[in-house]
Amino acid sequence: MSTVGELACSYAVMILEDEGIAITSDKIATLVKAAGVEIESYWPMLFAKMAEKRNVTDLIMNVGAGGGGGGAPVSAAAPAAAGGAAAAAPAKEEKKDEPAEESDGDLGFGLFD
């Protein structure tokens, strides 16, 4: 039941944030009740306190920026190690002009020379 309570309160917080409504425990509880989900009474209060201390929009936008991918290159992991507060702009790859590949014409490796 606790995972259902967490999920319902998470959705309620996202709805309130998206609508620009102040996030309070009463409003979270009202939304969850309107959805027909039964939760423990402490969940709305916990989520309301979390929303007071954190910017919910930043939390939503940085969901995928967290660590966890142990095989990622070091340069890509640096923004996540810095707290993930700002997403780093992807580095532009410079295209190097490579010489055109020469044909296999006369390299001395002919099979029937």
Swiss-Prot record:
One of its GO terms (cellular component) is cytosolic ribosome. InterPro entries: P1/P2_N_sf (IPR038716), Ribosomal_P1/P2 (IPR027534). Transmembrane segments: none annotated. One of its GO terms (biological process) is translational elongation. Residues 87-113 are annotated as: Disordered. Keywords: Phosphoprotein, Ribonucleoprotein, Ribosomal protein. GO terms for molecular function: structural constituent of ribosome. Coiled coil: none annotated. Pfam families: Ribosomal_60s. The modification Phosphoserine is found at residue 103. CDD domains: Ribosomal_P1. P1 and P2 exist as dimers at the large ribosomal subunit. Plays an important role in the elongation step of protein synthesis. Belongs to the eukaryotic ribosomal protein P1/P2 family. This is Large ribosomal subunit protein P1z. The lineage of its organism: Eukaryota, Viridiplantae, Streptophyta, Embryophyta, Tracheophyta. The gene is RPP1B.
